Amino acid sequence: MSKVSFKITLTSDPRLPYKVLSVPESTPFTAVLKFAAEEFKVPAATSAIITNDGIGINPAQTAGNVFLKHGSELRIIPRDRVGHC
C-alpha cells in the first residue's frame, strides 16, 4: 500500500513548528487531523486543517485524496484562531 506524507505546520505558534506525517493513502483524513492535533497538544475537536492559501479542507475524505487535491504542505489552526485578527 502506498503512503503519502504531509508537512503540517502549527500556525498559532509564532515559531511555526511543524511535523511530517506519513500515512497510508486510504487513511481517513479525520485520523490525520486527530493525530496532528495530539502531536501539537491542541484539541482535535476544535481544530481545522487548511492549505497554505488558507483554503479549508473537508476531513471527510481519504489522506490520498487530500494529497492529490492540496499537496503535502498543510497548516493546522485551533478554531479559536479562525477569522481572528
Swiss-Prot record:
InterPro entries tied to this protein: Ubiquitin-like_domsf, UFM1
Covalent cross-link (Glycyl lysine isopeptide (Lys-Gly) (interchain with G-Cter in UFM1)), residues: 69
UniProt PTM: UFM1 precursor is cleaved by UFSP1, promoting its maturation: processing of the C-terminal Ser-Cys dipeptide is required to expose its C-terminal conserved Gly residue.
Cross-linked sites for Glycyl lysine isopeptide (Gly-Lys) (interchain with K-? in acceptor proteins): 83
Location relative to the cell: Nucleus; Cytoplasm
GO biological process, one term: reticulophagy
An example Gene Ontology CC term for this record: nucleus
Protein name: Ubiquitin-fold modifier 1
Cytoplasm found in the keyword field: yes
Subunit structure, interactors included: Interacts with UBA5. Interacts with UFC1.
Superkingdom, natural source: Eukaryota
SUPFAM superfamilies the record matches: Ubiquitin-like
Annotated propeptide span(s): 84-85
The family this protein is said to belong to: Belongs to the UFM1 family.
Reported function: Ubiquitin-like modifier which can be covalently attached via an isopeptide bond to lysine residues of substrate proteins as a monomer or a lysine-linked polymer. The so-called ufmylation, requires the UFM1-activating E1 enzyme UBA5, the UFM1-conjugating E2 enzyme UFC1, and the UFM1-ligase E3 enzyme UFL1. Ufmylation is involved in various processes, such as ribosome recycling, response to DNA damage, transcription or reticulophagy (also called ER-phagy) induced in response to endoplasmic reticulum stress.
Species this protein is from: Bos taurus
CDD domains from the UniProt entry: Ubl_UFM1 (cd01766)
Gene3D superfamilies: Phosphatidylinositol 3-kinase Catalytic Subunit, Chain A, domain 1
Keywords: Cytoplasm, Isopeptide bond, Nucleus, Ubl conjugation, Ubl conjugation pathway
Keyword Nucleus attached: yes
Pfam families in UniProt: Ufm1
